[in-house]
């Protein structure tokens, strides 16, 4: 119906076999799909919008999915806008800020920002955050920066005292809040894909027992001060799976 650009490839990927594989498992499923269809991650600019969940807080949209919840705005064509429409509009400018790679977003967090503020990494990962009062930050994920200006720690729903003692609060009482949006370079995507580049590997990592978390299993280890010992103490979304060690 001429509502989406014909030059862009769109795909809706359910969790394999109808089983919940977690946001991390779903991301690995995306990587497999892209590699099968494009052959590599070079020259690919990919937007991933995770939209799973039970819609417990908004059950009236469980049938269509939270991503297609209406928002109080009418589009130029006269149709009522949805979260998906707003994502397409707000994220359309990000592609020009990256050579190749993937932007992963959470489908229930609408972000409005100027894409010109983004410098996508040539190699590695970068998270999109914004400054907010520490009182608000204690209810969200917060990034604590190291001496090089990179993310040193990912602190999730910590007290004001903990955030302050860990050096996550600036002189104005602000913290860097995690928005759920993360940029991955093409070479990092290729590295992640090696985890699932055979059917046997895919079966180990993408299943309803491990239920890998995009944030706990992917983002946490990327912080410069993360340790393996602390990572093992993080609570998994699914079962604690010995075979993944």
Q: Where in the sequence are the language-model features?
A:
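Unchanged
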Residues: 1-245
